[in-house]
């Protein structure tokens, strides 16, 4: 019997989340569950950076949602070479 690793060929995409409120939770859950809705996908999400103006909210959001790093400066996410997608979930008046 030969075991084949189907995850080895699926590239990861680095996600940066700008904002840490309800929509950050909702979007993160969506990324986590995309395969359960659509089946096999050509990528696997990697939760790289969460940004929020409040350091406390950024830290707590990153910890609770599973992001590897956090920042209080959204520009850090834009210039990070590990980021493929920037998801802006700030309040409407901020985007």
Regions found by a protein language model. Give the residues of each.
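N-terminal Rossmann-like dinucleotide-binding module
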Residues: 1-65
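Beta-loop-alpha module in the N-terminal Rossmann-like domain of NAD(P)-dependent dehydrogenases
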Residues: 54-56, 65-95
């Amino acid at each position: 019997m030969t075991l084949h690793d189907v995850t080895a060929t699926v590239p990861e995409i680095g996600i940066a989340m700008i904002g840490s409120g309800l929509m950050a939770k909702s979007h993160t859950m969506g990324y986590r569950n995309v395969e359960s809705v659509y089946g096999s996908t050509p990528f696997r999400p990697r939760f790289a950076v969460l940004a929020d103006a409040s350091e406390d909210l950024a830290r707590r959001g990153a910890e609770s949602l599973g992001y590897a790093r956090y920042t209080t400066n959204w520009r850090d996410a834009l210039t990070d070479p590990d980021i493929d997608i920037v998801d802006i979930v700030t309040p409407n008046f901020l985007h």
